[in-house]
Each structure stands twice: as structure tokens, then as C-alpha cells.
Amino acid sequence: MSDPLPAWSDAFELGRLPPVPQLVLDGPINREWAIGGSTGAGIKVAIIDSGIDASHPAVGSVEGAIIIEPDDSEPDGFRVIEGPHTDLYGHGTACAGIIRSVAPDVSIYSVRVLGERLTGKAWVFATGLEWAIENGMNVVNLSLSTSNEAHIPMFHELTDAAAFAHVMLVSAMANEPKTTVPSEFSSVFSTASIRSDDPYEVRYNAAGPAEWAARGVDVDVAWADGSSITATGNSFAAPHVAGVIALLLAKHPGLTTFQVKTILAAMATAPGSVTQ
């Protein structure tokens, strides 16, 4: 009898490996090849934030919505409320409007974890992220984060789960120079803002910790109560990247997290043109 293989070896036996899409190239990886002609149809995008105003003309339809809020009377310390809801601040609506403008045919889902002051509890945020992973979202926009080091293990476990489930997590870096999670984990699309008039422009920084940058300075965004404002911040760059990733996944389904990163990096160095 042969000695047993070391742990994890069985998963790599022929016939057991899950299929990974092979990219067939007929030219350079550029913006036209990656997202040209795509509208994001068939892609589910969750926005974990302050809620979404589905009646805002810049947002369009919201396919699903849940609220996760603390509740000491519940065994787990929180309750989940399914169904339409309002945006308590305007921040989530802004992100939804940006994503809709970049990828008009995506299915948007709202996961409300922040309150009317745009604050919340890390474990409520984590519960919302877990919901997005378990409910088959393709892309998750995270224009929020935590700087509390005590929460690093919890979010590290969730971001790993997302990566292996091929769920793309796009997370805004903090607007101040401080360490935050999950934005700085390597499997996450950590995003900073640049001044640009091109909503499809994505820049790549291999040195990190902010790996990606997109339009996020003086951006006209949807806001609460049907209004709009001009805003600046990494929060508004992340949904631009999330929208571009949705376009990419719709055109090239089944890509892994690191395949998407490779393609985005190639787009950033050879942007080309795009046909929408």
C-alpha cells in the first residue's frame, strides 16, 4: 500500500479539478477586447452600504434588498429584513447610480448595513458580506471599511471565501492615509480615486496598497430624495471599477478573481477604445 498523500493533494487529481475558463486571444488584451459591446446583462452586483433609493431615476430597478441591523432580542444579535427600503444617507444611492451608468443592464442588490450617520458595526457589515457571497453575487461594491485590527481575521476569512467563490470584491480605500480592511487584502480590488472624465478608465498600481484607481473626483452622483450632488472620494471610484468588472464578467463569464485582475492590469496599460 502506498503512503497517503499530503493534505490537499487529492483536490488536484485529474478529473477533480473544477474547470477554469481558458482565454482565447485573437489580439491584445485591451478595453475593446475586454468590455466592448458589454452592458453587464446577467451579472449580479451587490452594494453593501446605506441602502438604495430605487425610485431615483439614475438608479433604475433594484432586484433585491435586505437590511441587516443590530437587535439584541435575536439569538444572533441582529435581524435581517427583506424587501424594499430607503437610503438613510444617500451614499448607497450614489454608488448604485454610478454602477448603473457604467453597466446599465446589471442586476443591482442593496444590502443596508449603515445607519443615517453612515456608521455601523463591523460584524453587521461582515454579515452583509457573507449574505452577498452566499447568495450568488458576482460583484460586491464595498465603499466602506474598518480600521479596527480586531476585525482583520473575520474579514480575511470572508474575503478568502469570496475569492474561491469567484465573487469580485471592490473596496474603496480610506480617504485618509490609514490601514483599513477588507480593502487592503490582496484578493480585493482596492480602489482609490483620480480626476478623470472617462468612466471606464482604470489605472493599475502594482506597488499597492491601493492597487486600482478610477474616476472619483468632482463626480456628479445620485443622492437621497431624488437629488444629486458633486462628490469626491474613493467611495465613488470603487463603483466605477465594480461597473467595469461587471462588463468584463458579462462578456467573459466564469473568470476567477486573479484572471480579472490580470485583464484589468492589461487594460490599464493598453486602454484602447470601447464600443458601448
What are these regions (language model features)?
Residues 33-40, 120-141, 151-167, 177-190, ...:
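Mature extracellular/periplasmic domains of secretome proteins
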Residues 180-250, 254:
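Extracellular S/T/G-rich loop segment that most often corresponds to the catalytic His/Ser-adjacent loop
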